[in-house]
Structure formats: structure tokens, C-alpha cells
Curated annotation (Swiss-Prot):
Role this protein plays: Endoribonuclease that initiates mRNA decay.
Domain of life assignment: Bacteria
Coiled coil residues, start to end: none
Top EC group: hydrolase
Main subcellular localisation: membrane
Keywords: Cell membrane, Endonuclease, Hydrolase, Membrane, Nuclease, RNA-binding, Transmembrane, Transmembrane helix
GO CC annotation: plasma membrane
Family classification: Belongs to the RNase Y family.
Name of the featured protein: Ribonuclease Y
The keyword Protein biosynthesis is annotated on this UniProt entry: no
Membrane topology: Single-pass membrane protein
HAMAP family xref list: RNase_Y (MF_00335)
């Protein structure tokens, strides 16, 4: 039993030891946990303080950056404001200068107007003075000489004419020089700009065409038995077929380029086909005619596209195409019309006028030449009638009538079209005249110049585009020759027709000769 007691005591001791160990371990665990909690709490407080510190620094940094950015924005806004103020200031200065220039121009215009008004008053005063003197002289003549009123009047007029002719000539030169210089410079600038901006190629038109043949045997086949082929050809086409000794070539002659072109193509088709007889000639003629009709339509459309004019009636476009086969003084009329339209458009643009209207009038100004050989009347009258029929405006019709002076221009564009027509026609090499008309025109030029008083001789030069007039130096002066040049030019304009511009040059030469012995 004793050993049982020892066992019980042992178990009790073990249990007590275990309980004591557990108690001690729990206490230590609680202490360790408390330490960990305390350490964690301290760490948390440290992290919170660190985060608060970092947040405070970030906040300060953000505030500083925001202030710097706001300052930079304010500086940029201030720079932009100063820049705009400077631009406004410069603009105001430019406007002020422009106002000053306009004011000076107004003053200059006022001065010129005052000068003209004073000059007018002075002239009226002189005229009145002349009239009073004339009356006084007339009265004295009647009293002293016992002549009639009409005789006295004639004597007075003759004396006044001789006395004041020189003064009138000098006054004419002054007025002409003063008021034409600026206009002349401006006009030359505009015309020069227009011409240099439009410089087309040009090929002179002739009245004959040549067709190459494969061999000379073809000439006999074209003539046919007893000349029946050539007679049929000339009857159908209305063109002369000239067959001479020129090897492998025949010549077509006609003043009508349209008929000549149809005839040329007919010959080419006959030569290519090889079968030449009257029936075949008629067949090939119809084919060539149809080809040319298509080409006429295409030429009209190309001209309209080139110039940039729209809304034309199809029949007007067809008439334009026919101008491709029409010449005037050797100049192709369609090429001339396109050139006039382009020059008129450039001039209108320079002067701030209606460019489209000027181009339209320029393109259509010679439209009547398409059928003037088929209808009675001048090409301007025919053209105006055709345009009216196909719905063109009165302004365009006036351009057609005014470009040769049959009507007064009712719009500035009409005057521009007339000027463009003259520029195109006056271009060197653009036009030709036949020899007979050319010689007659030169003779008439010299005859007009020689008809004036104090003219010694006159010579037409530069292919009739200039006439030089030699005057007596001892009976004229520099003032009177200006008036003489103006009078001759005016008479030439009224009495002669000529392409382009004609220059009148009056020459006064004084020579003194002495001999040394």
C-alpha cells in the first residue's frame, strides 16, 4: 500500500508541477503579449506620426508648386496682354498713318480742284477780256475805216486767231501733260501686267493648204478622165485644187479656212482609200465634213473651258468652234477671242471690275465672224443679233457693238473688252494685210499728214504703225507741234481703219550751216 501512496504523491506532485508550470508559462505569455502590444502600439504611433509628417510635407510642397504655377500663369498672361497691347498699338499707328496719307491725298485733290477752278476763272476772264477788246477793235474799225460789220468781225477774228494761237497751243500742252502723265503711267502698268501674265503662242494663218501624195501618179487619178474628178471635187468642196509640177504634192486654195480644211481631209481620205471617182469623192467629203463638225464642237468647248465661262447656249459654243476656221488679217479668230477674253479678265482684275463679265464679253466679241460670210451685215451686227437670240444680256451685246465703236460702252467692262481687242490685234506679228490694202493705207496716211499747214514731208514707217511728220522749223515751235500731232491722230482715227495702234511723231529740226574758208 505504501507504494500506492508514493504513486499518488508522485501524481499529485506532477500535477502540481504541471499546474505551476502552466501558470508561470501563461504569465510569461501574457507579459510577452503585452510587450508585443505595447511595441505594436508604439510602432503604430510612430507610423502615424511619420505619415502625418510626410502628409504635411507633401501638402507644403503642393502649396508651393501651386503658387509657383499660378505665378507662372500670371506672368504668361501678363506677357500675352503686353503683346496684344503692342499689336494694337502698332495697328493704331498704321491706321493713323493711313489716315494721314488719305488726308494728304484729300488735300492734294482739293488743291488740284482749286487750281483747275482758278484756271477756269482765269480763262473765262481772259475770254471776256478778249471779247471786250474784239468789240472795241470792231467799233474802231467801223468808225475809222467805214467798213461793214461782217468785214470788221472777220478782221478781228483773224487778228485774235493769230495773236492767241500760240497761247492756246501752250495751254493745250500744259493741260495734256499734267493730266495725262499719271493716267498714262497707270494704264501702261496695267496693260504691261496683263500682257506679261498672258503670252500665248501664235501661228500665222494662210489661205492655202498642201497635201502630200505617195507618188506623182496620184495626180492623174485626182484629175480623172477628162478632168471629171477635179471638177467634181471643186464643185462639192468650193475649194480650188491646184495641181502643178511640185513633186508629190497638191495645193488647196480658198479664203474660207473651214471649206479648205474639209477639202484637205477629203483629199487625204481619197489618197488613203485609193478609189477616186465622183461618187467616192462625195462619200469622202461627207465623212470629212462630219469630222470637222465634231472638231468644231470640241474646239468651242475647249475655248469655253480655257477661259472659264459657263452658261453658254450650245449653239453659241458651236459658233465659237467655227471661229477656229476663220481668220481676220491672217489672225485665227478663235485664238484671238480667247486671248481677248484672258487679257480682258486680267485688266478687269487689276481695276477691281467684274472679271467673269469681262471674260464673257471678250470671248464673244467676234462671234459674228463665224457666219458673216453667210449673212448680210457687219460681224458686230450679226453677233449682237445671234447673242440676243440665244439669251445673252444687254451688257454683253453692248460689248460686241462697242468694241468697234458702233455703240458707246455702257459699262467699264465694255471699254476693257475694246482695249483688250486692240492689244491682241496690235501685238507684233498677230495680223497681216494684203499688199494692195497695205499700200493704199500707207499712201492715205502720208496724204493726211501732208495736208496740214507748215508740213514739209511725211513718211509712213514700221509697217504703217507709225507716221513721221517733218515740219518747217522757222514757222512752228514746240508747243504748236504737240497740237499738230493731236490733230493728225484725231483725223486718222476718224478717216482710216487699221489694226492696232498707230503712232504719230512730229519732228521739228532747226539746222544752222556756216562755212570756214
Amino acid at each position: 500500500m505504501e507504494w500506492l501512496i508514493y504513486i499518488v504523491i508522485l501524481f499529485v506532485g506532477i500535477a502540481a508541477g504541471a499546474f505551476f508550470g502552466i501558470s508561470v508559462g501563461r504569465k510569461r505569455a501574457e507579459e510577452a503579449l503585452e510587450k508585443k502590444l505595447k511595441a505594436a502600439k508604439e510602432d503604430a504611433e510612430s507610423i502615424i506620426k511619420s505619415a502625418e509628417k510626410e502628409a504635411s510635407e507633401i501638402k507644403k510642397k503642393a502649396i508651393i508648386e501651386a503658387r509657383e504655377e499660378a505665378h507662372q500663369i500670371r506672368e504668361e498672361i501678363e506677357k500675352e496682354r503686353k503683346k496684344r497691347e503692342e499689336e494694337i498699338k502698332q495697328l493704331e499707328e498704321r491706321l493713323l498713318k493711313r489716315e494721314e496719307m488719305l488726308s494728304k491725298r484729300e488735300e492734294l485733290i482739293d488743291k488740284r480742284e482749286n487750281y483747275v477752278e482758278n484756271l477756269k476763272i482765269e480763262l473765262e476772264s481772259k475770254a471776256k477780256e478778249i471779247e471786250e477788246k474784239a468789240k472795241e477793235i470792231e467799233r474802231r474799225f467801223i468808225e475809222l475805216a467805214g467798213i461793214t460789220h461782217e468785214q470788221a468781225r472777220e478782221i478781228v477774228l483773224q487778228e485774235a486767231r493769230e495773236k492767241y494761237e500760240h497761247e492756246i497751243a501752250k495751254f493745250f500742252v500744259q493741260i495734256k501733260t499734267r493730266y495725262e502723265d499719271e493716267a498714262d503711267k497707270y494704264a501702261k502698268k496695267i496693260i504691261a501686267d496683263a500682257i506679261q501674265r498672258y503670252a500665248p503662242e501664235y501661228i500665222g494663218e494662210v489661205t492655202i493648204s498642201t497635201v502630200a501624195l505617195p507618188n506623182d501618179d496620184m495626180k492623174g487619178r485626182l484629175i480623172g478622165r477628162e478632168g471629171r474628178n477635179i471638177r467634181t471635187f471643186e464643185k462639192i468642196t468650193g475649194v480650188d485644187l491646184i495641181i502643178d509640177d511640185t513633186p508629190e504634192m497638191v495645193t488647196l486654195s480658198s479664203f474660207n479656212p473651214l471649206r479648205r480644211e474639209v477639202a484637205r481631209r477629203t483629199i487625204e481620205k481619197l489618197v488613203q482609200d485609193g478609189r477616186i471617182h465622183p461618187a467616192r469623192i462625195e462619200e469622202m467629203y461627207e465623212k470629212a465634213k462630219a469630222e470637222v463638225e465634231r472638231e468644231i464642237k470640241e474646239a468651242g468647248q475647249d475655248a469655253v473651258i480655257t477661259v472659264g465661262v459657263g452658261g453658254l447656249h450650245p449653239e453659241i459654243i458651236k459658233l465659237l468652234g467655227r471661229l477656229k476656221f476663220r481668220t481676220s488679217y491672217g489672225q485665227n479668230v478663235l485664238a484671238h477671242s480667247v486671248e481677248v477674253a484672258q487679257i480682258a479678265g486680267l485688266l478687269a482684275a487689276e481695276l477691281g471690275l467684274n472679271v467673269d463679265k469681262a471674260k464673257r464679253g471678250g470671248l464673244l466679241h467676234d462671234i459674228g465672224k463665224a457666219i458673216d460670210h453667210e449673212v448680210e451685215g457687219s460681224h458686230t451686227d450679226i453677233g449682237a443679233e445671234m447673242l440676243k437670240r440665244y439669251g445673252e444680256s444687254d451688257e454683253i451685246i453692248n460689248m460686241v457693238m462697242a468694241h468697234h465703236g458702233q455703240e458707246e460702252p455702257i459699262t467699264p467692262e465694255a471699254a476693257i473688252v475694246a482695249a483688250a481687242d486692240a492689244i491682241s490685234a496690235a501685238r507684233p506679228g498677230a495680223r497681216r494685210e494684203d499688199v494692195e490694202n497695205y499700200i493704199k493705207r500707207l499712201m492715205k496716211l502720208e496724204e493726211i499728214a501732208k495736208s496740214y499747214k507748215y508740213v514739209e514731208n511725211a513718211y509712213a514707217i514700221q509697217a504703217g504703225r507709225e507716221i513721221r511728220v517733218i515740219v518747217q522749223p522757222d514757222k512752228t515751235d514746240d508747243a504748236t507741234i504737240e497740237k499738230l500731232a493731236h490733230d493728225i491722230a484725231t483725223r486718222i482715227e476718224n478717216e482710216l481703219q487699221y489694226p492696232g495702234v498707230l503712232k504719230v511723231v512730229v519732228i521739228r529740226e532747226k539746222r544752222s550751216v556756216s562755212y570756214a574758208k
